[in-house]
């Protein structure tokens, strides 16, 4: 199949009530390479010999941005279907079709049925469940091959983060330091705050990226809390721009050290002042 794509019909019940095709979304399931999970029963991560673990393809990401794709012969291509029932929907059983096409040529009609109950959920922003799924804007930039923090980057993130907001997400994941988890992920987390040591030895901080990120996440409906990482990164190594040498430098220091207390004392004083000015101090952790 050279141009696999899909669409929905309206869904109707026997009384003539309908659910618009706009209530339905779908995405192609993509595959990634992985290895055996928890083979040794220890339930831990860390270094291990790759030859001891078998590799395999697993269905993982749901690509909601891809509108069509080619599918080789004798392979399976799943499609994930999601239905967002509007609060105004009349209870009942609705029937409709998922149309599978190759370009403009119809391949298959899949009959679907959904039962709408009389119970009604509030809007996701009103849900009490404290959902905290970490976000990685860096992975999105790499996946869609767009410059980090560009308008194209934010445009690519918006539908993804809106899906997260619609799931009831409450927390914004923000990073204050370079590689807080020592870059163990495919796309390491960088700092959203620029740390600068001036030529006179004092500290200055630029929150431009942090502010843009938080404001963007709030614009999609995720605004209850900001979790900031990390005062104690795995490597206890902190990156900063050194004005005296016009270069990026690293300092290794730990809680209790004079250097640690000096730099973090300056940072927290500056950061708390900035958060209060933005009105975010009480929701930041």
Regions found by a protein language model. Give the residues of each.
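Extracellular Ig-like/FN3 beta-sandwich strand-entry sites
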Residues: 76, 91-95
């Amino acid at each position: 199949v050279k141009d696999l794509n899909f669409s929905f019909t309206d869904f109707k019940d026997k009384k003539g009530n309908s659910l618009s095709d706009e209530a339905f979304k779908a995405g192609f399931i993509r595959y990634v390479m992985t290895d055996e999970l928890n083979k040794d029963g220890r339930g831990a991560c860390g270094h291990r010999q790759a030859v001891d673990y078998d590799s395999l393809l697993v269905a993982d990401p749901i690509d909601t941005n891809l509108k069509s794709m080619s599918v080789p012969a004798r392979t399976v291509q799943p499609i994930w279907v999601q239905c967002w029932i509007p609060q105004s929907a009349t209870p009942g059983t609705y029937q409709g079709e998922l149309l599978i096409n190759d370009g403009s040529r119809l391949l298959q009609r899949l009959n679907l049925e959904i039962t709408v109950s009389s119970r009604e959920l509030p809007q996701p922003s009103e849900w009490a469940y404290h959902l905290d799924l970490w976000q990685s804007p860096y992975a999105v930039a790499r996946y869609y091959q767009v410059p980090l923090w560009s308008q194209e980057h934010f445009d690519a993130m918006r539908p993804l983060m809106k899906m997260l907001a619609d799931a009831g997400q409450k927390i914004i994941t923000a990073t204050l330091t370079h590689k807080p988890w020592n870059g163990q992920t495919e796309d390491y987390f960088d700092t959203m705050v620029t740390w600068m040591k001036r030529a006179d030895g004092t500290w200055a901080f630029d929150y431009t990226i942090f502010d843009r990120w938080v404001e963007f996440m709030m614009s999609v409906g995720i605004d209850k809390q900001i979790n900031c990482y990390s005062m104690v990164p795995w490597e206890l190594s902190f990156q900063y721009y050194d004005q005296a040498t016009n270069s990026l430098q690293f300092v290794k220091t730990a809680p209790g050290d004079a250097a640690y207390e000096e730099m973090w004392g300056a940072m927290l004083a500056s950061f708390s002042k900035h958060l209060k000015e933005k009105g975010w101090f009480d929701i930041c952790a």
